[in-house]
Amino acid sequence: MQFNAHDYQRAAIDYVVEHPRCALFLDMGLGKTVITLSAIQDLALNRFEVSRVLVIAPLRVARDTWADEAAKWDHLASLDVACAVGDAKQRSKAIESGALVTTVGRDTIPWLVENYGKAWPFDMVILDESSSFKNHQSKRFKALKSVLPKITRMVALTGTPAPNSLLDIWAQFRLIDGGQRLGHFLTHYRDEFFQPDKRSAAQIFTWKLKHDADLAIYARINDITLSMSAVDHLDLPPVTSTVVPVDLPAPARRAYKQLGEQMLLALPHGLVDAKNAAGLSNKLMQLASGSLYTEQGTAELVHSAKIEALGELIEAASGSPVMVAYWFKSDLARLLEAFPQARELSDAASMRDWNAGRIPVGLIHPASAGHGLNLQEGGHHMVWYTVPWSLELYQQANARLARQGQRFPVSIHHLIARSTIDERVIKALETKDVTQSALIDAVKAELAKTNHPSSAKEF
């Protein structure tokens, strides 16, 4: 297929070529993969400035998206892409093939550095979804940081560089420019641009930006950062977002209240114990969706209200495929049981079948199938069975359908259990307040509704 680059894509390609170390903050749907591959093609095969390229991406994107995109476009026919995914033998075979472009899953980086760090073969590295490197204490960050002196070009790609806070971008730029712009240490960056927010006498729980610090941060990184928004460049399909209220049956409502009050709930086949605020948030979300994991590891059915509501939405779609985003494994099992026509979208074959219209109900987990996947050809209806706290995963999953190439208006439905933590999660997503402190505040609010203020103060 012939690639006719839009003006914004041409500008992005040139930016990568002209900036050895840079960040592309490209909104979902702008074509960051073909942009980057086009820049690689120019750098490696026209200018001879790059010999080998490593693409670090979410597992499924590393396995499927980059090779598929290279094969799709005529001008990229000379690019050979090796996928270093699988067991150690398969990964080594791909790396030692000498392919111009090698793709790896991000969790493979420690293994890669341990085995190939001394004779590091890649002079250019692409961080696809660089926000996954926001934790400077992670093994992947430390491993990649150790080989930075051997890398001459680094490109970071993401649509959500700071999903929770501008604290998230420090580690990404530490890898991009070696600490030149935002400093070599997180503590120095934090002290310069942030001040304590929520704290106790001995511990700081959250940080907030100092006055105009965000503008100062943007000014620091501006010379190596290109940011583009989809609304400025794409004719995207209209998106309708709706909340579908779900009423819990009386027994489930009583169970929800008891769990909120006591943080304990006895079920017929096991005990549910929420040990802290984060644990209680998780348990309340499980219960709102219909089942609970017990201390014994079993999933106990509490209600089927959301299953029934989903059935009505599927029926209303009148045969049009519906994508359902789930969060808990217990929900996946229940969905597969309740809807025999459903199929989990977990591998390349199932995603091809979805795009071909062969799957009437596709079940997707946003954590494993959000970034970089093109699923817009298979349908335009999406239902959130359980809405997660993660704004990044939420936006990325929605963009699988609401993206360039979608031929129909997109409908996104949220099954929200009335008067439960579901309502607070969706509100947090709407206001983009999805920090840990928002989660704690939501749990406090749930406890306060049970008239046990002393319990709420424990957090």
What are these regions (language model features)?
Residues 1, 18, 31, 35-41, ...:
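Conserved Helicase C-terminal RecA-like lobe
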Residues 1-25:
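Conserved pre-motif I regulatory segment
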Residues 35, 50-72, 163-168, 328-329:
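Conserved Walker A/P-loop ATP-binding site and its immediately adjacent core
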Residues 61-86, 176-179:
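Conserved helix-turn-beta segment of the N-terminal RecA-like "Helicase ATP-binding" lobe
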Residues 78, 97, 124, 141-232, ...:
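Conserved P-loop NTPase motor "coupling/switch" region that bridges the ATPase
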Residues 88-122:
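Conserved helix/coil segment N-terminal to the catalytic DExD/H
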Residues 110-115, 164-166, 330-334, 351-355, ...:
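SF2 helicase motor core recognition
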Residues 389-459:
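A conserved SF2-helicase RecA2
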